[in-house]
Regions:
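Catalytic loop of short-chain dehydrogenase/reductase
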Residues: 4-11, 17, 43-85, 94-97, ...
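A hydrophobic alpha-helix adjacent to the NAD(P)-binding/active-site core of NAD(P)-dependent oxidoreductases
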Residues: 15, 23-24
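C-terminal helical subdomain
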Residues: 85, 92-93, 100, 108-129
Length: 129
């Protein structure tokens, strides 16, 4: 699951209500809706779900994004523990920083040259599982 809303970075006291709602709906609520829908399909085919973590929780200005992303990953961890014996497998990976649109929104003007290739990072994550 890689769908995410990257709300504008802002101090917690300045988080816009619309951005907060959108962050909760996309980053957390959608995950809670998708899991019951896809679990039977994944279990029937011995499938797996992949979640992508982001280590920005607790950093200044990342409040809306980090709070909802952390909640999403917590839900995924619970699901992984619940299905460890029965399936589906639930994987959580922390990709290396990559030159994505989300990262560009958070770090405009960043030198993107040293960032990991999305193709290489995808291969790395998929090879682990």
């Amino acid at each position: 699951h890689a769908a995410i809303h990257a709300a504008p970075l802002a101090p917690a006291g300045h988080i816009d209500a619309k951005d907060w709602d959108k962050s909760v709906n996309i980053n957390l609520r959608a995950t809670g809706i998708l899991i019951p829908m896809i679990e039977p399909l994944l279990r029937a085919k011995s499938g797996a779900a992949q979640f992508l973590d982001d280590p920005h929780a607790g950093e200044k200005f990342f409040g809306a994004y980090a709070a909802t992303k952390t909640a999403q990953i917590t839900l995924a961890r619970s699901w992984a523990a619940e299905t460890a014996k029965t399936g589906p497998k639930v994987h959580i990976a922390t990709p290396a920083p990559m030159p994505t649109a989300t990262r560009a929104r958070f770090f405009p003007g960043e030198d993107r040259a040293p960032l990991a290739s999305p193709r290489d990072e995808a291969k790395r994550i998929l090879s682990v599982h």
